[in-house]
């Protein structure tokens, strides 16, 4: 919702809080079969993508989210080659994954082509890798797609979803997580956006950890990171592994990476493994 014609405001009624950005104009609005998509030009945060009234990304700070949802997992796997992205319609995750030269194939499965079309038009910097021959973009149900994949056929699965309501709710459940475990190889990992440790520790995060462990994953580790435009300003990615621990990542490769990042590096990777006292035993899997 907007407080007036010059502001976009996301209100979190249950948390008693709101986040606002001053906007210059609305660039795009459409209602697809799945969700309500809006794009704004803001005064200070570049362009703003909103889905169903919730901030999805801004030009100014999306790099933190996309880098922390991709590179920690890819540098934890010993040799990632086959990757699937479930969701990720803005294609920023696809761009980050394809920076890794060893990647042979990435399949991105998002249910709503409208998000990708909006990103191509208004966030071209995020979609610059869409024509990479290693990339396949599908517009389908990610839960159903995972069920159809052969056992052991993927190295890393990244679940870049909206909040766990509506079309994304099934991506947080034990049925889907069990299927992800099945399609991953022996050293496979999945990473899931897991909301705010401040706002959702006792609801979404605790439940997600339980479902992941119940599906066979160990270790399960949550990496927190800042995203100013998201509720509370503090977000997280949860890595669930069939073997490798994020603390034993390929640190020398991360330090010698041949591609540019704006947030992620080997020191950030290691620092993200440190959990505050109120989250120890949950975020650290100890």
UniProtKB/Swiss-Prot annotation:
The question of whether Cytoplasm is a record keyword is answered with yes
Reaction equations catalysed = S-adenosyl 3-(methylsulfanyl)propylamine + putrescine = S-methyl-5'-thioadenosine + spermidine + H(+)
Which pathway?
Amine and polyamine biosynthesis; spermidine biosynthesis; spermidine from putrescine: step 1/1
Q: Which residues form the PABS domain?
A: 5-242
In this chain, S-methyl-5'-thioadenosine is annotated as bound at 35, 110, 141-142
* Primary location class: cytoplasm
One Pfam family cited in the UniProt record for this chain? Spermine_synt_N
Residues at the active site:
160 (proton acceptor)
Which InterPro entries does this chain map to?
Answer: PABS, PABS_CS, SAM-dependent_MTases_sf, Spermi_synthase, Spermidine_synt_N, Spermidine_synt_N_sf
Location relative to the cell: Cytoplasm
GO biological process assignments: spermidine biosynthetic process
Residues reported to bind spermidine: 66, 90, 160-163
Entry GO CC: cytosol
Which keywords annotate this record? Cytoplasm, Polyamine biosynthesis, Spermidine biosynthesis, Transferase
Its EC number is 2.5.1.16
Superkingdom: Bacteria
Could you tell me which HAMAP family the record lists for this protein?
Spermidine_synth
The family assignment reads: Belongs to the spermidine/spermine synthase family.
| The protein's name | Polyamine aminopropyltransferase
> What is the organism field in this record?
Alkalilimnicola ehrlichii (strain ATCC BAA-1101 / DSM 17681 / MLHE-1)
Taxonomy of origin reads:
Bacteria, Pseudomonadati, Pseudomonadota, Gammaproteobacteria, Chromatiales
